[in-house]
């Protein structure tokens, strides 16, 4: 399947917009065919986009959003309220095994190691009960700029 860069970009934009705005990745049973219908493109085209343009499979794409959702939940202190498995399920993972596998693949660390490191770097969160995702992103941006000076 040959697509122009513009066509591929349009499909990818529609796909990302759908995932972000609808938070479709939270559906543990989300199927590629459902996503294709939702964004108005045929399933075979979506398959080609994953293979040739995004260089990852459908489930890796969806799981990348789920991992980011988990990290956001940790930044909001939700790991203090829920078990690891419950939090993973709330982020769209169907099983503990698939969660651990995906998390390690995208972060290079286990969820437990990530939480320990996060708690070590952000001890104030124990007092405040977490921060919003927006503040978390802002703080990371400031830290990144300081490190590059």
Question: For each of these PLM feature ranges, what is it?
Answer:
Residues 115:
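Short, flexible helix/strand-to-coil boundary loops that buttress conserved ligand/catalytic motifs
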Residues 1-86, 90, 102-105, 112, ...:
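Membrane-proximal linker segments that couple transmembrane helices to downstream signaling/catalytic modules
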Residues 43, 95-97:
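The DNA-contacting recognition helix of HTH DNA-binding domains
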Residues 98, 107:
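Ser/Thr-centric signal marking residues that sit
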């Amino acid at each position: 399947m040959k697509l122009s860069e513009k066509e591929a970009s349009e499909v990818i934009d529609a796909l990302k917009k759908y995932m972000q705005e609808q938070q479709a990745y939270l559906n543990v049973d989300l199927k590629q065919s459902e996503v294709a219908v939702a964004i108005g493109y045929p399933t075979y085209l979506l398959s080609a986009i994953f293979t040739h343009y995004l260089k990852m499979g459908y489930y890796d794409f969806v799981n990348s959003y789920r991992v980011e959702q988990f990290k956001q939940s940790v930044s909001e202190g939700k790991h203090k309220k829920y078990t690891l498995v419950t939090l993973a399920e709330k982020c769209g993972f169907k099983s503990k095994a698939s969660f651990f596998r995906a998390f390690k693949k995208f972060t290079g660390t286990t969820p437990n190691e990530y939480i320990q490191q996060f708690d070590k770097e952000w001890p104030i969160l124990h007092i405040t009960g977490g921060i919003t995702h927006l503040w978390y992103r802002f703080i990371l941006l400031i830290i990144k700029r300081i490190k590059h000076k």
